[in-house]
C-alpha cells in the first residue's frame, strides 16, 4: 500500500531511511527515580557504561533522559536535567557514532544537549510544552521526535491526572481541547500532531528533520493504546518516519495478567514476562512500519524486530529454497 513508500529522517547531516528496517533505540535513564530500573543507572559513569552495553547488544540509537516522566514522578529543574545529561552526552560522543536522542521537552535542556553534540531531541509534548523549543531545534541541525501527548490533549481524562504537568496550556484553545476529547483517538492524534508540525515549521524545522510518535502509554485506555498501534500507518500516511515506545507498558502487563501470566516485577518470572510481552509488541510494531522502537532491554527485542522486518519487507526478499529439516 501507499504507506510502504520510503520515508527519510535527517539529523545532524545524517539520514535514517525507512527502507533500511527498524532501529532499536535503547533507553538510558540518568535519573535517580526512573520507573523501570529503580535508578540503577544514576550517575554518569553508570549511564555511560549502560549505554555502551546497549550498543554492544545492537542498539542503533540511544535515548538519554534526565527527568522521569512516569506517572507520579517529581519534576526536576532544567538546570538539574542539564547537569545529569551533559556529561553523559560528552562522554558518549567520544566513543560512539550511534545517534543520541535526548528525552526532554525543555528548551534550555535541548540547547545545552545540542551544544555538546546531541543528534535528536525527543520531545514528549511535541513542541507544545515549551514555546522556545521549536526555535532552539530550528537553529540547529538536530532532528526531532514529536510525540502525541494525550495528557495535554485531554487534561480532563482521569489517566491524565496522575502525570506531572508538561506545560502547553496556551497552545490549544478550550474548544480545541474539547474537540480532541470528543474525537476517536486516532483523529485526536492527527489533529494534535498537525499542530506540532506547524509549530516546528514556524520554528525553522523542516519535514525531513521530523519523526512522529503516537504516544503509546501516556494516560490512555487499553483500547486506545491498541488502536494507536494498529493504526501506526497513519503516521507514515502523513509522510513521516514513526517512533514507538513499546517497553514495559502497563496495558501490555494488564493484557497478559488477564490471560493468567505472572507479571509481578518483584519476581524473576514476572520481570522477564514484562520484557517478553514488550517484545511481542516490537514484532507487531516493526511489521506495521515503525522506523525506531524505544526499549529498555535490547536483547529481548532483537529477534522480534528481525522477524517483523522480514514480514514487512517480504516483497523485497529473494526466494530462498530452504533445505529439508534434518537433512
Sequence positions of predicted segments:
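N-terminal amphipathic alpha-helix/helix-capping segment at the start of soluble metabolic enzymes
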Residues: 2-29, 198-205, 254, 258, ...
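Alpha-helix-loop-beta-strand connector modules within alpha/beta enzyme cores
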Residues: 74-102, 107-111, 139-149, 229-244, ...
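Alpha/beta enzyme core
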Residues: 43-64, 95, 99, 107-120, ...
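C-terminal helical cap(s) of enzyme catalytic domains, especially alpha/beta-barrels
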Residues: 295-321
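N-terminal small/glycine-rich loop or linker at the start of catalytic domains
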Residues: 14-40, 72, 89-90, 147-181, ...
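Conserved, mostly hydrophobic/aromatic
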Residues: 28, 54, 58, 103, ...
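Glycine-rich, proline-tolerant flexible connector loops at the mouths of alpha/beta enzymes
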Residues: 34-36, 60-87, 215-222
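Conserved anion-binding
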Residues: 32, 69-70, 116, 128-221
